[in-house]
């Protein structure tokens, strides 16, 4: 790959000297989509991602406009060729279908993570370590000033809040991003035996999760009493 296996092209990351963009927002001829959060989504001529990510992206963006846009689903740990490149996806542990990408060319491997979570999750595939020579990592909270409590502590606090609210005879309300965080909370509570109701926007995402094997059978839609 030479000295710089990755480059900026029109403000987007691209594998040097190729058409393969990484989580591009602007339309590209070919792009890898690590996951379906809005800050990574774009409409491209060809999109490489896991089947779950492609389904979530279609749910969020709608069908391709004017018939443009080819979805190229790829399975984890299954190398495939793209021109002179060999690509392989690995779970990223961020949300359902999230993936890291390993790009090999001329014996040199580039690793690109997108958002990455190495802690155990309730509703996403567990992250794996991929071997590479050059690693490009998204680090939203990479600065040392960001210090969060351990995840088990946070989950215990959520459960304590829910129990306290129910003991007081009131309905506990939890807020979370509609894709990812909401399903983590709902799956955690459902597995603990709580019956939950989800906002219709969250419920629509839940259906995609369920279609890809994440059991959310105790999660019911909440009928809105007013427009949202």
Language-model features: locations:
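Short, solvent-exposed amphipathic alpha-helical segments in soluble enzyme
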Residues: 37, 127-129, 188-193, 213-214
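Single conserved hydrophobic/aromatic residue that forms the stacking wall/gate
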Residues: 219-228
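Divalent-metal (often Zn2+) His-rich catalytic cores of metallo-beta-lactamase-fold enzymes
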Residues: 173-192, 201
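Long, charge-dense
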Residues: 197-214
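Short, charged/polar "capping" segments at the starts of alpha-helices
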Residues: 54-58, 184, 203-208
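His/Asp/Glu-rich metal-coordinating catalytic cores
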Residues: 2-26, 30, 36-175, 180
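The feature marks the mature, well-folded catalytic cores of soluble enzymes
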Residues: 156, 166, 195, 213-219
